[in-house]
């Protein structure tokens, strides 16, 4: 089979049309081909792939990708090529979330490999230094070792300016968000308000929905100051259900949302658990 390719120009034109029409842009993470196929059929605009999504699809928490137990970029490239691309019809574009701090990779070659398989969008969240608390000892150690947000900004700029790819920035803090938008000028920027709550592997603490909307809107305002044309989407924290996303749309000035666990891990857990339990509860009538 041959999956239809979507050019960068077509992706950007489609995004502009939705922004102009005030239609929410939806980005969805997928850790398996089945989930990606279902998301595309449902109408998502972008399927993003990253090692955390693949780990989630196998029952681990997203944060497993933060430990040096796998080659994050190789995991992402392999399952994107083998599981995701063959499952799609070409309606949704694919964004590969990459680790720009990989010391064993020339990111030009990684980005070129993405393009060769038909992926014309890249993000810095695979994982990102922005995950790590800047007051922590591990952040200081990482910085001294050259593992920095600077490399992520460089990759996003290179993807957009040199590789003609759609660049999708993501940050967890106002400081990182401003830097990424101001220096990398990504086509799309996602403010990550924190780990998604709920489910078997979800985070039980975090912000309320109202707090999520407030901090997201604050980030949007700061990002627009340095990059007025950026497309802004929300993600994380209390954004778990469709009604939560609706609240974010109604109470922020962004252009859409990015779903992760909300449209893959959580519905899979719920549906499979119920179906399996219904079968497991069967008994002989005689």
Where in this protein do the model-derived segments appear?
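Active-site beta->alpha loop and helix N-cap motifs at the rims of alpha/beta catalytic domains
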Residues: 35, 42, 46, 63-150, ...
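Glycine-rich phosphate-binding active-site loops on the catalytic face of alpha/beta enzymes
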Residues: 46-58, 117-133, 186-202, 251-275
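Short beta-strand/loop segments at the ligand-binding rim of alpha/beta enzyme cores
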Residues: 12-27, 87-99, 158-170, 219-237
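Internal active-site segments that recognize and position negatively charged phosphoryl groups
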Residues: 149-184
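C-terminal helical cap(s) of enzyme catalytic domains, especially alpha/beta-barrels
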Residues: 59-70, 133-134, 201-212, 262-286
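Catalytic cores of alpha/beta
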Residues: 33-42, 104-113, 174-184, 237-254
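N-terminal amphipathic alpha-helix/helix-capping segment at the start of soluble metabolic enzymes
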Residues: 1-29, 37-41, 82-91, 284-286
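Alpha/beta catalytic cores of nucleotide-metabolism and tRNA/nucleoside-modifying enzymes
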Residues: 1-6, 213-233, 239-286
């Amino acid at each position: 089979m041959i999956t239809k390719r979507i050019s960068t120009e077509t992706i950007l034109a489609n995004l502009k049309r939705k922004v102009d029409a005030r239609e929410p842009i939806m980005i969805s993470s997928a850790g398996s081909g089945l989930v990606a196929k279902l998301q595309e059929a449902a109408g998502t605009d972008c399927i993003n792939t990253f090692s955390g999504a693949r780990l989630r699809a196998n029952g681990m928490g997203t944060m497993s990708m933060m430990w040096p137990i796998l080659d994050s970029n190789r995991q992402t490239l392999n399952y994107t090529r083998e599981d995701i691309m063959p499952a799609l019809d070409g309606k949704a574009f694919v964004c590969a979330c990459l680790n720009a701090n990989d010391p064993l990779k020339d990111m030009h070659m990684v980005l070129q490999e993405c393009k060769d398989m038909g992926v014309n969008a890249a993000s810095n969240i695979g994982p990102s230094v922005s995950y790590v608390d800047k007051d922590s000892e591990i952040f200081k150690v990482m910085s001294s070792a050259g593992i920095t947000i600077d490399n992520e900004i460089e990759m996003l700029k290179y993807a957009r300016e040199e590789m003609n790819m759609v660049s999708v920035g993501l940050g967890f803090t106002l400081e990182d968000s401003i830097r990424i938008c101001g220096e990398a000028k990504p086509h799309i920027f996602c403010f990550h308000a924190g780990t998604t709550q709920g489910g078997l592997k979800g985070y039980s603490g975090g912000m309320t929905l109202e707090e999520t909307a407030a901090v997201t809107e604050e980030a949007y305002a700061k990002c627009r100051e340095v990059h007025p044309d950026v497309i802004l989407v929300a993600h994380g924290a209390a954004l778990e259900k469709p009604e939560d996303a609706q609240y974010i749309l109604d109470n922020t000035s962004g252009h859409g949302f990015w779903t992760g666990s909300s449209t893959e891990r959580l519905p899979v857990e719920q549906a499979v658990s119920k179906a399996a339990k219904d079968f497991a509860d069967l008994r002989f009538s005689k």
